Amino acid sequence: MSQNERDSLELERKNTPPDGPRLPERRPRFSVWIYLAIFLALLVHFFLFWTGTDTSTIEYSQFLEYVEKGYVERVEIVNDTKVQGRFTEAAVREGLVSVPVRQTDLLRGAQTPELIRRFTTTKPADHDLTSFLLAYNERARAEGRPTVQFTARIEENWFGGLLTWIFPLILIVALWVFLLRRMSPSSQVLNIGKNRAILYDAMGDHRVTFKDVAGLDEAKEEVAEIVEFLKNPKKFTRLGGKLPKGVLLVGPPGTGKTLLAKAVAGEAGVPFFSISGSDFVEMFVGVGAARVRDLFRQAKEKAPCIIFIDEIDAIGRSRGRGIMMGANDERENTLNQLLVEMDGFNTDKGVIIMAATNRPDVLDPALLRPGRFDRQILIDKPDRRERLEIFKVHTRDLILGDDVDLEVLAGQTPGFAGAEIANVCNEAALLAARKGKEAVEMEDFEQAIDRVIAGLEKKNKIISPEEREIVAYHEAGHAIVGWFLRYTDPVVKVSIVPRGLAALGYAQYLPEERYLYTKEALLDRMTMAIGGRVAEELVFGRISTGAQNDLERITRMAYAMVVDYGMSERVGYVSFNLSGQYGEQAFFDKPYSEETARLIDEEVRRIINEVRERARRILEEKRDKLEALARRLLEKEVLGPRDLVEILGPRPYGDYPSPNGKDVEELKDLQKGEPTSSSAVEAPAPQTERPESSSAP
């Protein structure tokens, strides 16, 4: 036996309880409804078959014949439809009538002579049996023969009537219960107020710790205090300190807010309740508040623990919003109950409330006040160093080739969130497996980045030569205008290969990680965005629908400059912030007059016209470079930094486009006429511009 087998047996022996292995609990396979149905079936069978007696059934015509012959002694008419009678002893004894013969029954006993003489028949509705018997008795008296005694009675079938009323009721109740169970397992009447929180075992097989959360160093430092509190609460309460009752994780989608909350539970080793904000609200009134109470009740029972509410803006929006459209009373009641539960929560219990949202501006102020969610932790998109750590986490289970450089990949993916980086790694592994490779190479990662940014490459999409030429000049216009402006991002790739749902071409840039933009920087970006449309107009004398996304972007930026950032001299240093502070009411109650609105529209048009003329001047001056770049695009379809430097010359502002900083000197030497290596630098990078769309606006 090998050492591994001995270790496995020893581990199994340790995990086996002293009283032997525990068998899984078996639940009853039959529900109470099945037992009830069986009982009712037996009851019906008993009343219908066992309560009756064994009597012979004869035809009505034969019954009339027996009466005429004097074989019948007594007749009883039941409900004017059924006839029960008794033969004479002489007729039975002499065998003049047919009677049933059966063996002795243990349940009903022996067959007596009285039972043998009985018979039953069915009376037709159109026959007057009473008149027939009266006429027979008169003839029998006249002839001196025995007469037939007859009576009539009304028999009520109480059991049949009971079934007529109860059976439909039982059927309706069973159908109602069945429909409730089909709609949702938790939609039963008794469980409608139960919360839908999922309890994760922090010490289970899928435990998440801070090692699984790459980057986010500042955020992990903030939540480390929470972990320490859950491990050793007396350390804080001994000196009279209190931990914040609520921690709100704020950040863009995909940055790791939920993952960080799971890591907190994994590090502290406590139960972790996870629930979405939309799970509280139901179609029934009062269910949301009941689920909040039930959630906090369970949390108190399992303290110390963590309650994590994902997308809390679903129930935490400011009260009073949307009055013009009608307020949601159920959502507000749920929020009120949440506020009450959090305000009365005792931090000594060891229960921490965490929530995540990417819309903190719409949350109710009462939810953010001290004593509730009084600590906000920003989970922002990672920088280059943090992206490198994220790549290390997501590639540790991949078989990487020798040419894979994670530092280069981190430089090629500025603006990527953690979820997008994970998607890039997974796409690269799938591409390598599709090609039958033994390891994931750098080429696979570059193609995966292109795929995540611009979508799937459509090699077989048929485009007419005219449209292909328009797309080439459009993308060349973007690249040239951006190349010769000071505050634009370096162009690293231009392509006219169709990608995605409707993209006919795209340009990729290497954006700098900046947080402030000047007025000049915004104008340069708008000029670059409109360069494609201006190039079409300059070369072909007409425009196409491919610039729809460009026009949307520059219009949005122009309105932001005038309305939000106060960058218009005519409007002044004001900020109306329509997308943030005023929320839904901004569409109905704008904080400025009609005259100001007209002035804003005029300023937006003026700014767009200025950047358009600026782009036209640049393209007219660089017309030869525009033609050369478009011809090279039509020839190669994809151009990298080396091709751009060869055609456009040195970039007048900023560094040469290089995602990793290793090819800057090589590209500079290219402009001086010095020999360089034959390998082209075509490293893709995330675009600041969405691919051009072929759809009409």
UniProtKB/Swiss-Prot annotation:
The active site is at residue 475. One of its GO terms (biological process) is protein catabolic process. ATP binds at residues 251-258. Binds 1 zinc ion per subunit. GO terms for cellular component: plasma membrane. Its cofactor is Zn(2+). Acts as a processive, ATP-dependent zinc metallopeptidase for both cytoplasmic and membrane proteins. Plays a role in the quality control of integral membrane proteins. This is ATP-dependent zinc metalloprotease FtsH. It comes from Rhodothermus marinus (strain ATCC 43812 / DSM 4252 / R-10). The gene is ftsH.
